[in-house]
Amino acid sequence: MSKKITIPSILISILMAGLVAIGINQGSVSISGISLIYFCCAFIFLAQWLIFIPSYIFETEHYFDLTGSLTYISVTLLAILFTVDISLRDVLLALFVWIWAFRLGSFLFIRVKKAGSDGRFDLMKKDFWWFLMTWTIQGLWVFLTLAMALAAITSESKMAIDIFAVVGTLIWIFGFSIEVIADQQKTNFKDNPANKDKFITVGLWSWSRHPNYFGEMVLWIGIALIAFPVLIGWQLVALISPIFVIFLLTRISGVTMLESRGYKRWGCLLYTSPSPRDLSTS
């Protein structure tokens, strides 16, 4: 990929994260006069760039998804540790992020180790700027996805558990369950030799070609609902979080990328599949 695309994309990713950080730092606790949100944002990007170095040297993508998941866990822990006044809402947010990140990170790491490689990275891992752009965008992904949770956890405004927290928790459980079940169903399907060179249309996959992504979108909406009541003023910029997740999964890296690869592999069979692209379109 041309440097005319990769370098500006890297800079734009950093700029976007910086602008959102400036917005949601209002009302956030500070460390030595500096908003904890800024520390979290910097930590996220530095973690990606640190692991990018050996990954590029050894041309491996094996630790890409794992690094992202560990970053979710560690930066949320950082926010919890440096926020003095922690509420039950904060604990719920952190717990849900940790459960999701640990489950997905371990699942993806085991999958790539088992497969030996991830086809998404075949070309980009050999191109310094393209690969760096990908790691930087992951940093943006982590920060924007976590924006609602981080803004709420680090906020000086605290509230008792309310209807938003209850409904948000139920939505998170629903979305997380769909993602876990969908991933397990696909794993079981691919482990069956009789299904070689076939695409899955059983279980949740008979309703959608991407139920796992649907579940992920839903669970982050749940987290946004839990976090919403304690946000004030410019912290509401964090509402970009679930919108960003939905846009990214449906238009950039998730559904769009897999649909493109799917059409190349299975062609017109996808058109005759009973499964729509997404549960939201069924």
Model feature map: region roles:
Residues 128-133, 197-206, 214:
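Alpha-helical membrane-protein architecture signal
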Residues 47-53, 98-114, 144, 170-189, ...:
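Transmembrane alpha-helical segments that form the membrane-embedded catalytic/substrate-channel core
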Residues 20-39, 77-95, 146-168, 225-238:
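Helix-coil boundary and interhelical linker segments in multi-pass alpha-helical membrane proteins
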Residues 43-54, 71-76:
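Central hydrophobic cores of alpha-helical transmembrane segments in multi-pass inner-membrane proteins
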Residues 271-282:
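Single conserved hydrophobic/aromatic residue that forms the stacking wall/gate
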Residues 110-126, 184-203, 258-273:
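Cytosolic, membrane-interface loops and tails of multi-pass inner-membrane proteins
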